[in-house]
Amino acid sequence: LVQMDIVLGNVAANQAKAQAMIEEGCRQGARLVVLPELWNTGYQLQEIRNLAEYEDGSSLGMLKRLAQEYCIEIVAGSIAETDGTHVYNTAYVIGQDGGIHTKYRKIHLIGLMAEDRYLSPGNRRCLFDSVAGPAGLIICYDLRFTELPRAMALAGCRTLFVPAEWPSVRGRHWVTLNVARAIENQLFVIAVNRVGKDLDNDFYGHSMVVDPWGEVLAEGSEKEEVIVVDVNFAAGEEIRSRIPVFRDRRPECY
């Protein structure tokens, strides 16, 4: 888990920091690396059209090279992605072969941080096969919408990745929602938040891994750090068998 501070609008500085922290994780044996939301720019939304990258841009190029060099899977947080017309808050998954395996455009844009003024929303959920098993991907504000993780769990998701830029003022929500999503959907949650501050917000950090029983297996501080966690994803099946909510649910009554 790459819990990093982000220099607002300074892509080169953020790329250098992300690379150093990824390499530190690899030295500690990481096979899967997760970055925070908008890790290469931060919420520099007034300049986001100038900062946005195509898929062949330098930020993803760096991550593709690192994934292949170290034989790791990277859940590449998110970056501002342009298709030439629109700009999206887009998370990518880069495989051990250095290729883009999937991407997810953030569905729920948060008005409190003016995303809806500068970005376009996505309209498709994201499920993929990960080294962590069947996985899903949401971004930050999406965490508040219970329907999306539930639909993903019903479709087979067993690990939910949540890159974020979550402010300290709502820090209690961050912890509570990550644990709740893990318990109610009986899946692992791997949530990576930034630290530091921008012009308007202090960011909470506390990146975490939560198991399907709601136990927090690891939790970061409010400082920059690389958090390496050994997770037995296969243990999720035993946890799910204890309280078989998906067997017992009665959606026809809801």
Task: Give residue spans per PLM region.
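Generic N-terminal amphipathic, Lys/Arg-enriched alpha-helix
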Residues: 1-8
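Cys-nucleophile CN-hydrolase/nitrilase-fold catalytic domain and related Cys-dependent amidase chemistry
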Residues: 11-12, 19-97, 103, 166-187
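Short, acidic/polar
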Residues: 13-22, 144-150
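Short beta->alpha transition motifs characteristic of CBS
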Residues: 41, 48, 92, 104-110, ...
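CN hydrolase (nitrilase-like) catalytic-core segments centered on the catalytic cysteine
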Residues: 55-75, 144-227
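Short beta-strand scaffold segments in enzyme catalytic cores
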Residues: 76-78, 90-93, 126, 207-209, ...
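Active-site catalytic loop in hydrolytic enzyme cores
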Residues: 82-158, 163, 167-176, 203, ...
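A conserved C-terminal secondary-structure "cap"
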Residues: 237-254
